[in-house]
Regions:
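Surface/interface-facing alpha-helical segments and adjacent flexible terminal/loop regions used
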Residues: 1-155
Length: 155
C-alpha cells in the first residue's frame, strides 16, 4: 500500500516517522545539555511538546528555571562533571579526536549552532539527532544507499 502517491509503503512511512521522533529526542537531549541562554526555555518547551516521553518531559519541566550559574556549577570548568569528550581521553590525543569530529561534522554537513566546543556532549547529542534526521530524509526520498551510509556513521 502506498501513501499519497509517493510510492512509499506503510513500513517506510513508519521508518521515517520513527527516525524523526528519534531525531527530536536527541535534539532535545542536546538542548538540555547546553548552557541556558535567552530563548532556551521556550525552545526546550516547544520541542518537548512534540515528544511522547513522559520521563524526558519531566526533565524539561525540572530544567525550565535553571540558571547559567547552576549549569556551570554542574558542567562548567572545575565542576564535578565534564561535558567534554576530551576529558575522558586520559593520555589519548585530543587533537586526533577533534580532527575526527571535524571530519564527521563536515562530511555530513553538520554545523552546530551551539557555542560549545565540538566535543561537548550537547554538540555530540545534536549530531546524533542530525544524523537521525538525515537518515529519515534519505528513507523518505527512497535513497536506501544514503540511509545506510548515515546509519553506519551513527553506529
Amino acid at each position: 500500500m502506498s501513501t499519497a502517491g509517493n510510492g512509499h509503503d506503510a513500513g517506510a512511512t513508519t521508518r521515517v516517522a520513527d527516525g524523526i521522533a528519534r531525531a527530536a529526542h536527541w535534539r532535545l537531549l542536546g538542548l538540555l545539555l547546553e548552557r541556558p541562554r535567552a530563548g532556551w526555555s521556550t525552545e526546550i518547551d516547544r520541542l518537548a511538546d512534540e515528544i511522547d516521553d513522559p520521563p524526558l518531559r519531566a526533565v524539561v519541566a525540572a530544567a525550565r528555571g535553571i540558571t547559567e550559574g547552576e549549569y556551570h556549577a554542574l558542567l562548567g570548568p572545575g565542576a564535578p562533571l565534564s561535558p567534554r569528550e576530551a576529558s575522558a581521553l586520559g593520555f589519548g590525543d585530543p587533537g586526533w579526536m577533534f580532527s575526527e569530529l571535524a571530519r564527521f561534522y563536515e562530511a555530513f554537513g553538520y554545523a552546530p549552532r551551539a557555542e560549545d566546543p565540538p566535543d561537548h556532549v550537547a554538540v555530540e547529542a545534536g549530531f546524533v539527532g542530525f544524523l537521525e534526521l538525515k537518515e529519515s530524509l534519505a528513507w523518505a526520498n527512497g535513497d536506501a544507499e544514503a540511509a545506510h551510509t548515515v546509519a553506519a556513521a551513527r553506529a
